[in-house]
């Protein structure tokens, strides 16, 4: 009887410890295939699901030349197969093996390009109320302008930028159909996204 009681207490302690270790807003992020999103692994970013055929590409705004500079992250409608560019998530906490919601991270394009940018996403303020995502960021933990987080929406995910309720913004899309710039605006719409290890274009 004592042994059974000891085992029961041990199981309860394990359950309590496990439950308390999962903090709200700290859940694992999953990709479009249902796998855990991991740091330093290439992922393609789609607008909502791949069915929409809108993908993050690395291009110069309003240029059809793939080598034209400077380049930035753009959400492109119906890009050709060679255009979507995968990113990697670089975590501030190097001991983590998965990407979690709300975790501070850097977003970096995988392939180097001839424009001389670092490849790390960074928000530059264009006006007092609006910033734009460009590619001259850094991996430094002190570079807050290059620090993002992933949050869950109802069905998908979104990127957020900034710290605290007074400064937090959501990455949204410009109104420039069919190629959209990525904007950082408070109280704006959000760019709902999904992550894919493999490119599946509709």
Swiss-Prot record:
UniProtKB keywords: Disulfide bond, Glycoprotein, Protease inhibitor, Serine protease inhibitor, Signal
Kindly name one Pfam family recorded for this protein: Kunitz_legume
Q: Which InterPro entries match?
A: Kunitz_inhibitor_STI-like_sf, Prot_inh_Kunz-lg
Secretion signal span:
1-25
Q: List the disulfide bonds.
A: 69-115
Residues linked to a glycan: 93, 136, 144, 198
A molecular-function term among this protein's GO annotations: serine-type endopeptidase inhibitor activity
Q: Name the family.
A: Belongs to the protease inhibitor I3 (leguminous Kunitz-type inhibitor) family.
Function, as annotated: Exhibits Kunitz trypsin protease inhibitor activity.
Recorded protein name is: Kunitz trypsin inhibitor 7
């Amino acid at each position: 009887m004592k042994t059974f009681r000891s085992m029961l207490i041990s199981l309860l302690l394990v359950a309590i410890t496990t439950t308390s270790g999962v903090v709200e807003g700290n859940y694992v992020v999953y990709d479009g295939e249902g796998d855990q999103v991991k740091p330093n692994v290439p992922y393609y970013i789609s607008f909502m699901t791949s069915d929409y055929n809108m993908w993050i590409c690395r291009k110069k705004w309003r240029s059809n030349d793939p080598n034209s500079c400077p380049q930035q992250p753009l959400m492109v409608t119906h890009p050709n197969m060679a255009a979507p560019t995968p990113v990697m998530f670089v975590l501030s906490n190097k001991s983590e093996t998965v990407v979690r919601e709300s975790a501070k991270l850097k977003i970096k394009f995988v392939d180097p390009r001839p424009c001389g940018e670092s490849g790390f996403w960074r928000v530059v303020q264009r006006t007092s109320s609006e910033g734009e995502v460009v590619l001259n960021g850094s991996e430094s933990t002190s570079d807050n302008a290059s620090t993002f987080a992933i949050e869950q929406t109802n069905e998908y995910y979104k990127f957020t930028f900034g710290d605290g309720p007074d400064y937090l913004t959501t990455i949204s899309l410009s109104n420039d159909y069919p190629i959209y710039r990525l904007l950082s605006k408070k109280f704006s719409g959000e760019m709902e996204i999904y992550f894919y290890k493999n490119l599946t274009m509709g």
